[in-house]
C-alpha cells in the first residue's frame, strides 16, 4: 500500500506519520488495528522545506499554498491522507491553503487515480453551540471564522473526490498549541469554574486520533464521500479537565463557580489573546457523537484524553514556560 501524507510536519500529521511508520515496521506486533497482512506499506510525505523524517519515508517538497508545487505528488499512490491546514486568522492564507490548496490536491489525487482519500477537518465548521451529542446528520455547518469557513470549503473538494472526511474535536497531547495553552491563559484571566465547570467537550488525544486516521486510511474501503466525527466517544467534563491539568501542575487549582456574566466581566477586565468566543467553546457544551468511526475501523478508542495527559505533561510544561 502506497500512502501519500500531507501536513507531515504538523501537529496531527507528524503523529500520523509516526503511526504509519510503526504500522509498516517489520516485526511490528499484530493487533486489532493491525491484522496480519502481506502488504508492504510505503509512505511519501510532502513538506514545504527539507526536514528530517523517519527512515524509509520518501520526502517531496510541496506546499498547498503554492498549487503549482503539487504536480505529481500523488503519482503511484493508493491512499492520500490530507492532514494539512492553516488555522490562523489570516483569511487570505486560510483560503489559499484550506480551500484552493485542497482543491488542487484533490485534483492531483483524481489525476493519479488514488483509490482512497482521508481528509482531516474540524468540528469548528458547526460554529457556535451549545452542541450536545449530535451526529453529523443532526447539525448543519455554520462556520464563524475564516479558518472554519475555508476548511468547510475544503471538505467540499474532498467529498467530490470521494473522500472520507474526519471532523476532529479538540485535540490534546504533544504539539497542542491551542487547547491547553488557551486553558492556561483563561485560568489566569478568569480564575474560577466557568459555568461551574459543567460543560462537556469532545476531546481526543493526538496519539489516539493518529491511530484512528491510520486505521481509516488502511482498513476502510473507499468512502464514496462520507463525513464522520473523529472524537473520543466519551465527552470530558470541563471541571475534570481543569482538575487533571492542575494535578499535573499545568494550571493553578480553580474553585468557585462563575456565572457567564462573571466570566465575561473578568475576561474584559484582564485582556489577553483568547477571545470570548473561544471561552464559550471551552466552557459550554460542545460534544459530538463519536462511536461510529471507531466501530467501523475496529479501533479501540483508548483510555481517553484525560488518561493520556500525564504522558504529555513534560512537553506542556516546556510549552507553557513552567520549567
Predicted regions and their residues:
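Short alpha-helix in the Rossmann-fold core of NAD(P)-dependent oxidoreductases
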Residues: 95-102, 106, 118, 150-151, ...
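Conserved Rossmann-fold NAD(P)-dependent oxidoreductase catalytic core, especially the SDR/UDP-sugar
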Residues: 103-146
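Conserved beta-loop-beta element that borders a ligand/cofactor-binding pocket
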Residues: 155-175
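Mid/C-terminal beta-alpha module of Rossmann-like enzyme folds, strongest
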Residues: 212-276, 317, 321-323
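Amphipathic terminal alpha-helices
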Residues: 290-295, 300-323
Amino acid at each position: 500500500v502506497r500512502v501519500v501524507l500531507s501536513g507531515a510536519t504538523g501537529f496531527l500529521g507528524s503523529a500520523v506519520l509516526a503511526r504509519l511508520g510503526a504500522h509498516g515496521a517489520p516485526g511490528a506486533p499484530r493487533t486489532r488495528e493491525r491484522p496480519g497482512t502481506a502488504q508492504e506499506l510505503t509512505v511519501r510525505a510532502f513538506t514545504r522545506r527539507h526536514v528530517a523524517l523517519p527512515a524509509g519515508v520518501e520526502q517531496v517538497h510541496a506546499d498547498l499554498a503554492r498549487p503549482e508545487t503539487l504536480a505529481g505528488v500523488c503519482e503511484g499512490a493508493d491512499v492520500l491522507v490530507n492532514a494539512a491546514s492553516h488555522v490562523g486568522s489570516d483569511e487570505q492564507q486560510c483560503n489559499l491553503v484550506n480551500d484552493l490548496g485542497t482543491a488542487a490536491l484533490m485534483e492531483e489525487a483524481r489525476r493519479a487515480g488514488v483509490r482512497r482519500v482521508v481528509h482531516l477537518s474540524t468540528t469548528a465548521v458547526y460554529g457556535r453551540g451549545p452542541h450536545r451529542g449530535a451526529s453529523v446528520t443532526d447539525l448543519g455547518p455554520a462556520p464563524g471564522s475564516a479558518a472554519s469557513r475555508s476548511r468547510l470549503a475544503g471538505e467540499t473538494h474532498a467529498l467530490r473526490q470521494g473522500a472520507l472526511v474526519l471532523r476532529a474535536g479538540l485535540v490534546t497531547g504533544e504539539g497542542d498549541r491551542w487547547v491547553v495553552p488557551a486553558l492556561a491563559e483563561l485560568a489566569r484571566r478568569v480564575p474560577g469554574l466557568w459555568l461551574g465547570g459543567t460543560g462537556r467537550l469532545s476531546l481526543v488525544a493526538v496519539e489516539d486520533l493518529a491511530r484512528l486516521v491510520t486505521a481509516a486510511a488502511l482498513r476502510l474501503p473507499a468512502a464514496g464521500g462520507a463525513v464522520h466525527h473523529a472524537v473520543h466517544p466519551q465527552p470530558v467534563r470541563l471541571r475534570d479537565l481543569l482538575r487533571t491539568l492542575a494535578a499535573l501542575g499545568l494550571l493553578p487549582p480553580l474553585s468557585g463557580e462563575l456565572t457567564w456574566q462573571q466570566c465575561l466581566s473578568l475576561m474584559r477586565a484582564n485582556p489577553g489573546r483568547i477571545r470570548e468566543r473561544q471561552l464559550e467553546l471551552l466552557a459550554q457544551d460542545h460534544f459530538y457523537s463519536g462511536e461510529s468511526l471507531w466501530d467501523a475501523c475496529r479501533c479501540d478508542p483508548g483510555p481517553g484524553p484525560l488518561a493520556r495527559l500525564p504522558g504529555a505533561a513534560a512537553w506542556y510544561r516546556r510549552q507553557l514556560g513552567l520549567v
